[in-house]
Every structure is written in C-alpha cells, then in structure tokens.
C-alpha cells in the first residue's frame, strides 16, 4: 500500500505544524483539513500562520462528500474527540489508516471503537515546543511522530506505509516496536510537565532547572511509574531519564498545552492527566498524593475563570 492523500482534523499546534509540513510538499488537494463551516470561514479570513508564514491549506467541511483518505491524522484535544470522530466519517474507507496525535493513553481505543482497531496505528507526538497564540504558531523544535503497532514486536504493512510517506515528505518520525510503553512514557512526561508548568504559571525553563517545580514534576512522574508496573507496562528509572532528556531539548521559553490553556483561561486536559492517574490509583489501590495535589490546584485555577 502507498499513502498519497491525508486528512487532518484539528488545527491546534500539532495540526498546524504537521499540516503545514505536508501542505508545502504534496499537491494541494491531497492534504485536506477537516473543519466546520464557521471555522473554515475564520481560517480563510484571518489566516493560519506557522512561524510567520501563512499556511496554504485546502479546507473541507465534514458534510462534503469525498474520496476516502489513505491516512487520517487526529490532532484535536480529548474533549473534541467525539465530534472529530463524527466529522471524519466521509474520509474513512476500507484501506484508510488512522493515527491519533492526542495526549493520553485512551484515544486509539475510542477511535477504534468507531472505525475498527484494524485501521488504527499507535502514535506519540514528542519533542515539539510549539506555542500557539490565536491563529499564529511558533516553534523552535518540530519534534517527531513516533508510530507503531499495538502489538509489541510487530511492524505491519500499515506502519511501513506511513513511515514511507513521512520519509518521502519530510515529516520527522520514528517507528517503535513497543508502542504501549512509549505511550505510557509520554503520558508520564505530560503528567509531570504539563501540570507542573501550568500550576507554576511558567514555561519549560521552570522544570528544566533544579528547584521546587522540577521536584514536583519528577514526583508526579514517579507515581506513573508505580502504576505502569501494576498495569504490566513496567516503566523504569531509565524511561524517566529518557523523557527528562526529551524535556531538556525543548526551547526554555516554550510552554506545554496545559499552561497555554490556563493562560488563555480555557478548561484544560487535567482529567486526561492527573484525572487518569487518580483513576488508575483507585483501581490499583495505589496512593498518588502529588497528582491529587496537582489535580486540585488546576481545578482551583479553572474555577476562577
């Protein structure tokens, strides 16, 4: 199989970043940005910018009939996932491959419920330090999309096809043969970094240097390691150090999505991070006091909007 057409839903940081990369290299009609009519009007009127450059996107509404896409990329926030699943319906065909760049460890299963797990590859977006303000995105590091199969040790034809597509069009990627562990690792990083930077109302620099914020972040991450052992994923101290190394590559003035949400007075993905940790803690009878504190503090910030 060869991937020639891609549909992207969600023009947040990731959607703009990777959408722009592909739109500049493929025929315009081969990269479709799915958005409702109001959004399309706004995007066309105000523009969407990536590092100062106006993106030349081809927009389609969910209602428009079209040929199925070879690849669909979900780049929405978790609270927009159900709407997005409905919106891509006309783009899903028999041989469509779906990847989800969402945070957390649940979106693949939710998409798979709607369209079949046989269409879904696992994906982790990591290493980008993009900041989006309004319709303008800036970044120092593009990061990469890590893709692979649900089953450890397997590299399917779908994975090979997506890898070849990314290779051809300059999307930084990696194939991982243990995606469940990679997803839990990224989840661990998000639980630490996203929440701590949001609570301290700061930037990556706050958790890259030694101090109370970094201590809190690592303590929150260590609670995820304990839960991963109970869930059979078995993250280790080595994994913690790998993700701290990823963190050290990010531009110090950049901010994770949750800190950007708090700054813009939007409800955050706290349920996806400490909320999920608290659920797993309850299920496994494991105390997670640091994540409980982060959860309460972020909820308190949101209650003041």
Predicted regions and their residues:
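NAD(P)+-binding Rossmann beta1-loop-alpha1 motif at the extreme N-terminus of oxidoreductases
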Residues: 1-57
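NAD(P)-dependent Rossmann-like dehydrogenase/reductase catalytic/cofactor-binding core
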Residues: 2, 29, 157-160, 167, ...
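Short, well-ordered alpha-helices that flank and scaffold nucleotide-derived cofactor binding pockets
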Residues: 20, 24, 86-90, 113, ...
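Residues at the C-termini of beta-strands that transition into short coil/loop
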Residues: 35-37, 61-63, 102, 124, ...
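Short, charged/polar "capping" segments at the starts of alpha-helices
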Residues: 39-44, 108-109, 155
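Rossmann-like NAD(P)(H) cofactor-binding subdomain of soluble oxidoreductases
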Residues: 52-136
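Internal alpha-helical scaffold of NAD(P)-dependent oxidoreductase catalytic cores
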Residues: 91, 114-119, 134-237
């Amino acid at each position: 199989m060869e991937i020639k057409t891609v549909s992207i839903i969600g023009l947040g940081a990731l959607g703009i970043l990777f959408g722009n990369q592909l739109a500049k290299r493929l025929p315009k009609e081969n990269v479709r940005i799915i958005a409702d009519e109001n959004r399309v009007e706004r995007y066309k009127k105000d523009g969407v910018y990536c590092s100062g450059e106006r993106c030349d996107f081809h927009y389609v509404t969910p209602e428009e009939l079209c040929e199925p896409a070879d690849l669909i990329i979900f780049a929405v926030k978790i609270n927009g996932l159900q709407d997005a699943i409905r919106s891509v319906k006309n783009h899903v065909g028999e041989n469509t491959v779906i990847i989800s760049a969402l945070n957390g460890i649940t979106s693949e299963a939710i998409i798979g419920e709607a369209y079949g797990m046989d269409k879904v590859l696992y994906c982790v977006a990591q290493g980008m330090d993009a900041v989006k303000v309004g319709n303008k995105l800036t970044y120092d590091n593009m990061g990469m999309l890590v893709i692979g199969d649900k089953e450890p040790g397997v590299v399917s034809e779908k994975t090979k096809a997506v890898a070849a597509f990314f290779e051809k069009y300059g999307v930084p990627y990696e194939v991982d043969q243990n995606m469940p562990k990679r997803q839990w690792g990224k989840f661990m990083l998000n639980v630490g970094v996203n929440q701590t930077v949001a609570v301290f109302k700061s930037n990556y620099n706050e958790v890259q240097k030694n101090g109370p914020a970094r201590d809190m972040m690592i303590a929150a991450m260590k609670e995820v390691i304990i839960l991963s052992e109970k869930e059979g994923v078995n993250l280790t101290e080595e994994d913690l150090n790998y993700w701290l190394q990823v963190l050290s590559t990010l531009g110090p003035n950049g901010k994770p999505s949750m800190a950007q949400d708090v700054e813009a007075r939007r409800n955050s993905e706290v349920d996806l991070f400490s909320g999920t940790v608290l659920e797993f803690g309850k299920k496994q009878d494991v105390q997670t006091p640091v994540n409980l504190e982060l959860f309460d503090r972020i909820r308190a910030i949101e209650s003041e909007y």
